[in-house]
Each structure stands twice: as C-alpha cells, then as structure tokens.
Amino acid sequence: RGCNKFCTYCVVPFTRGAEIHRPPDHIVDECKRLADAGVLEITLLGQTVNHYRFEHGASVTVGGVVQPQKGRTYAGGHRRDPFAGEATTTFADLLARIHDEVPSIQRLRFVTSYPRDFGDDVLEVIRDHPRLCRYLHVPAQSGSDRILKLMNRGYTVAEYTEFLDRARAFLDQPEIGRPLMLSGDFIVGFPTETDEDFEATIALVERARYKSAFIFKYSPRPGTVAIEKLADDVPEAVKRSRNNRLLLAQARISEEIGATLLGTTPQVFVEGLSAKERKRRDRAQPASSAPKLPGGVSLTIAGRAASNHAVADTSEEACCSTKPREADADTLPEQVQLSGRTDGDVIVHFDAPPGRSPESMLGTIVPVRITQVRALSVLGTVASA
C-alpha cells in the first residue's frame, strides 16, 4: 500500500504514506487460505504493485512475526529489479511463488502497475506461468510529454509506448488463444492542456489499442501539489468535450478489439448476474420480497451468492431460492443471463444453458463462444464440454 511517486494531481502519498511491502510468506499464506475456501481467482492490489520487493533480514520482527517494510525510493526505469538476489523477493519472484505454491488458484492478476518500472523479469514470469492473466492495467494519464512533466509522471510518451511494445512482444499470442489485453487511465483538461496536448492523447489511445480505459475530467483535489501550484484554467465545457471525444474514441477501439474475439471460445470466470439480469429481477420483485446482497442482487443458492461484481460464499442458513414467486412467474424469463470475465479482463455476458442451474455456475470457469460484440462487453453462448 502507499506510493512514492508524488504525481501532482494525486493525494495518495499524503494520505496513505510511502510504499509498504508485506512479507511474501504472509501473502502466499493468505492466498492458500483463500484457495482452501474455494477461491479460484486472486487479484494482487497496490498503487504501484509492480514495485513490490521484500528484502529479507531488513524487517522488524514483533512476537516472532516479520513485519511489513517500507519500500525503497529509486530512480527506476529498469528492465530487471535492481535489487534482485537471494536475499530479496521481487515482484516477479512473488508471482512465480504464488503460481507454483497455490496450484488450485486458476487465475492470478494484479493492478495497478507503474509503466516506467515494469521490468522484463515480470513479463517473462507472466509468459512462462500459464495461470497468470495476460492483462495489464498501465495508466498513462496523458499523451503529451509537456503535460506528463507537469503531472510529475516520470516518463515520456516514447518510454511509455516502448513498454507497450515490449509487453506485446512477450505476451501477445492470439494464435494460441492468449492475446494481451491492456487498459489505461487518462485525465483530460489538466491545467494548461491545449488542443495540441489533447490531440497527442487521442494519438496515444489510438496507438495503444486498450481493451478499455478509465477516462476522467481533471478536478482540483485538496492536498495535492497541482491545486497549490497550477490554476484550473481549462473551461469546464472544454473538459467535457474532450472527455466525450476520448470516450468515443476508446469505445470504438474497444469494439474493434472485441471483434477479434468473435468465433473464439475463451475461458470465462462466472462472477454473477449480468447488469441486465439484475435490473430485470429488480423490476419483477419488490425490494422487500427477498433478502438482498450488496449491490441489490437476490441470488443465494447452495452456499454461493452473486453480488454486483463478485462471487462470495455464504452459510447454509443464508440460502434462499431464486425461483420467482407465483405472481412473478410470467414476468421473469426462463433463461438467466450471467456475466463473467476472460483472463484478459474482457466482460462476457451469456445465458445459463438449458439443464444447468445458474447457481451451480457461480464461481466456476466455463468455455463461452463469442457471438456478438459491444463497446464495453461481448456476448456469447456456453460451449459444449
């Protein structure tokens, strides 16, 4: 947790402090506990997760328990962790260890990565370990070198695109059903951003070919360097126009990338009901008619519950039927639309096949043949085993 980067628009280093790295044994043990509980997919989280590094023997021990340690600040821009060695667990080492020591975890992914410090050692581990997801979230924030410098991002557009090219050379293998999927973050309307700066951002999005991107209008945040030193001088109408234009460009690219999946049959982790299905059920059943999980979903069967974004275990006492009440039987369709993700983080919607209860599919991985494409998702049908 924490961050050492001090981007001028960001408050995280001031609110969460410097990077703190947990002992690798603690992380692996937690993954084992989750696997024993039936979890199939794990995401490692960090503000700059690829900075993870634990130097053995350098931590305080309390009651025989090794404590987390503060991460080093260093120049970065390396191809391999400069502190790698027998006394250090690097991020690449950690990924390989979880993969090898917790074989029942079917998917391991991580977010968010800092692009300048993404070494070949991590790319090699992803390539050589089949249960590591080929999905990288690598925020760019702008396609203008001038704006990147004002943001204190620490890299140029050329350095960022060099990383993308390197990542694709290691990991993009659509011919074996393992394409690399990328996502990014962008801020439009950062102080002093000109039309030329924004056009450079459009060009980067076209060049990067993200499967999705998180796009935001700049707004001053108390406690940041930007609010103290940079006037918020881009008019709101201009921010809104640029935001909408970038969203449209990304939507087109997302749909084009989705089209490359047509006719393929990726493995999909079933997370729960689709948004469309949740809305349909909400219309058909009053909020008071059934117990609700976080996100307003009433689906709890055989010890599993589907929420908005995840699958969670529940006790037998919490189980309830998803069969509609008699008064609603003609309102809800027989088919139930489920939602899940590929290992490349592409959202897939599909109907539970006849003869198979949707509840039994939650938290499983199923093959889905892709038949339709939308800007933010794809649709398909469950393939025969």
Residues of each region from the PLM?
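Canonical Radical SAM [4Fe-4S] cluster-binding loop centered on the CxxxCxxC motif
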Residues: 1-25, 58
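N-terminal pre-triad scaffold of radical SAM enzymes
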Residues: 1-8, 32-36, 40-43, 268
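Conserved, mostly hydrophobic/aromatic
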Residues: 7, 27, 44, 110, ...
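Conserved alpha-helical substructure of the radical SAM core
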Residues: 14-43
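Short, ordered loop/turn segments at secondary-structure junctions
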Residues: 15, 47-49, 218, 353
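Conserved SAM/AdoMet-binding glycine-rich loop
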Residues: 36-198
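C-terminal, non-catalytic macromolecule-binding modules
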Residues: 196-246
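Terminal RNA-binding accessory module
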Residues: 226-385
